[in-house]
Amino acid sequence: MLRLVENHSLAHSAAHSMPRTAAFFDLDKTVIAKSSTLTFSKSFYQGGLINRRAVLRTAYAQFVFLAGGADHDQMERMREYLSALCRGWNVQLVKELVAETLHDLIDPIIYDEAASLIEEHHTAGRDVVIVSTSGAEVVEPIGELLGADRVVATRMIVGDDGCFTGEVEYYAYGPTKAEAIRELAASEGYDLSRCYAYSDSATDLPMLEAVGHPHAVNPDRSLRREALSREWPILDFHRPVRLKQRLGGLSVPPRPALVAAAAIGAAAATAGLVWYASRRRSTAA
């Protein structure tokens, strides 16, 4: 059973009359212009979580990521490095550092084109789901900033002392992203043949293949080749813009509410995969 949130019953009844739909967005280099995790390295340094050497190493990783994307082996090395790096970090301190610097670091690097797409999908009655390999402590507040209805993100094991152990509970990457959206579709009544997905990386091919309307955004060479051969739309996002400038006087969306997942598969359930459902979610697709 899913723990209900406000007006969820209305959405549930509507789902019986019409299949619901969603738009699934990768985060890094799809919605924002950089790696969400690596962007906070300076904040983590100032907060005493990492040293200067780690700052330089993450800066180099950011450069490699931006220059050519990351293939499977690079993503695995990055996962191992970041897992070891965050061992012993106090989770509450991480959340506080992210909250304090979120608008300064992330707001300016959100693609205007992505923000427009998110608005268009919401206007069309679709849920918006951020599906990211980055850690939940970083992705969840970014999802809130963007007005996303749900978030799927990597989760680290937290010890009894409130610190990361350095072990990964759930890794939102490649096939596991596709598995997550299929399970979410089953629980929420999404018709995946009518859903949309957006990513920049060939590592997200399973997620793109899972929906009826896949889109390549700023694709790496491998994904561009696949998109061309399959005649998928290829989008070019290149205009980062501050949401405050873009949205003007609009109010910030209400904070998403946690949805407890029960039917997401044994591996994902054990891992503590989190989804967020906005209280302002649409009731039809």
What are these regions (language model features)?
Residues 36-37, 49-120:
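A metal-dependent, Asp-based hydrolase signature
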Residues 2-71:
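Active-site neighborhood of HAD-like aspartate-dependent phosphohydrolases
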Residues 2-11, 18-20, 103-285:
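C-terminal cap/substrate-recognition subdomain and adjoining C-terminal extension
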Residues 32, 74, 130-131:
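Short, surface-exposed helix-loop/turn micro-motifs enriched in polar/charged residues
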